[in-house]
């Protein structure tokens, strides 16, 4: 009797998002989950600290249980098997993508499925223009927009604080492919090994997987981007847990979102014109971006998702500033500033996001200074 096929999925970036995904893949599928580390030293550190186990505490479940699973195999550039990679999940920080991928590029080819699960925007351009420049040998590219709230506490434990699902879609390598027919989703659901794994009924239900066209995912990505543009830098600047600022965050969220939307409407014009162009065409999904991505609605939604559902969460950017790590501000609020410049818009149209980015960067610099020179407030 032939043994059932077992998919192998490599995960590059075993931080908060990589961990929550890996644990649930181990819980609900039979996939071989292989974390990839950037060096032999980091691999040895993981094995020494965790004993080849990955764990997460589910704060939203009664009793806040910890789920811990052993990983059968871990690799780094020095120990890598040198075999082609079938499925690769990238959950590194956006600014780390190019460097993290570099050692594994020889094993990524046109048959590889690569999914990005990251905050921010702008990585697709990086992949197209600087990494996968040969259009004939590019991998099958997917994006995951994750809304789960996960953070690492001071004891090193990852905490899954809020359950909110993940959207996945095939990414287009060219702008001409931005608008996809429903048949693209149907074909991947039937024939693509990564999509089939992520949409296995048990895992898909528990992780909240929603497989869609690119335009639907981009809609969700812009929605999530607006959440991140508010929650990440503001919690980092204020040094607060999400729910603490619920009563007072409205005015600053309004300023950030209103400015972002003005720029995004220009940069992603086909998406914002989608409803009037494709509504009623059965080959395309129904979607009205302009009914959702309004300033008033998004301030309400960001507050609901960020400060209510994930009230106990500490944002990834706040965690980075607390642990003195580089922050992703250039791919979030900084991305809006860069878009405005690329589109030759008035520099004043992005002054709020520019200031927010500068304050978040200043918060990180202040925390780093205090770690060396002490906290002057205590003198």
Swiss-Prot record:
Indicate which residues the UniProt annotation says bind substrate. Answer: 119, 228, 232, 316
Per the record, the pathway is: Cofactor biosynthesis; (R)-pantothenate biosynthesis; (R)-pantoate from 3-methyl-2-oxobutanoate: step 2/2
Superkingdom: Eukaryota
> In which residues is NADP(+) bound?
13-18, 119, 328
Give, as one word, the top-level EC class. Answer: oxidoreductase
SUPFAM superfamilies in alphabetical order: 6-phosphogluconate dehydrogenase C-terminal domain-like, NAD(P)-binding Rossmann-fold domains
Alphabetically sorted, this entry's keywords are: NADP, Oxidoreductase, Pantothenate biosynthesis
As recorded in Swiss-Prot or TrEMBL, the protein's gene is named PAN5
Task: Provide the function of this protein.
Answer: Catalyzes the NADPH-dependent reduction of ketopantoate into pantoic acid.
What is the E.C. number? Answer: 1.1.1.169
Miscellaneous comment in the UniProt entry for this protein: Present with 2600 molecules/cell in log phase SD medium.
Q: Report the record's Gene Ontology biological process terms.
A: pantothenate biosynthetic process
Q: Does the keyword NADP apply?
A: yes
Q: Which GO terms describe its molecular function?
A: 2-dehydropantoate 2-reductase activity; NADP binding
State the similarity comment: Belongs to the ketopantoate reductase family.
User: In its UniProt entry, what is this protein called?
Assistant: 2-dehydropantoate 2-reductase
């Amino acid at each position: 009797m032939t043994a059932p096929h077992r998919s192998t999925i490599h995960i590059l970036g075993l931080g908060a998002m990589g961990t929550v995904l890996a644990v649930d893949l181990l819980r609900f599928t039979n996939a071989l989950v292989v974390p990839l580390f950037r060096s032999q030293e980091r691999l040895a550190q993981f094995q020494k600290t965790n004993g080849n186990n990955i764990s997460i505490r589910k704060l939203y479940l009664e009793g806040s249980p910890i789920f811990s699973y052993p990983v059968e195999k871990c690799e780094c550039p020095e120990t890598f098997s040198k075999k082609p990679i079938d499925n690769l999940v990238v959950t590194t920080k956006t600014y780390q993508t190019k460097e993290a991928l570099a050692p594994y590029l020889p094993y990524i080819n046109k048959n590889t499925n690569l999914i990005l699960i990251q905050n921010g925007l702008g990585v697709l351009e990086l992949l197209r223009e600087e990494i996968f420049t040969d259009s004939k040998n590019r991998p099958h590219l997917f994006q995951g927009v994750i809304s789960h709230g996960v953070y690492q506490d001071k004891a090193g434990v990852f905490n899954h604080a809020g359950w909110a699902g993940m959207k996945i879609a095939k990414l287009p390598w060219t702008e001409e492919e931005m608008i996809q027919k429903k048949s693209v989703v149907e074909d991947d659901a039937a024939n693509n090994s990564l999509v089939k794994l992520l949409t296995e009924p048990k895992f898909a239900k528990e992780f909240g997987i929603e497989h869609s066209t690119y335009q639907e995912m981009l809609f969700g990505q812009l929605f999530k981007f607006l959440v991140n543009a508010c929650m990440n830098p503001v919690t980092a600047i204020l040094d607060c847990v999400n729910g603490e600022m619920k009563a007072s965050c409205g005015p600053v969220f309004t300023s950030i979102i209103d400015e972002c939307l003005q720029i995004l409407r220009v940069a992603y014009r086909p998406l914002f014109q989608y409803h009037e162009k494709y509504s009623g065409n059965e080959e395309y999904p129904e979607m009205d971006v302009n009914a959702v991505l309004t300033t008033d609605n998004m301030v309400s939604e960001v507050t609901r998702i960020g400060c209510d559902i994930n009230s106990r969460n500490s944002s990834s950017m706040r965690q980075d500033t607390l642990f003195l790590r580089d922050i992703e501000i250039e791919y979030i609020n900084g991305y809006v500033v860069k878009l405005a410049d690329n589109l030759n818009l008035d520099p004043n149209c992005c002054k709020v996001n520019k200031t927010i980015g500068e304050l978040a960067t200043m918060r990180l610099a202040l925390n780093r200074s205090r770690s060396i020179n002490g906290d002057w407030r205590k003198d």
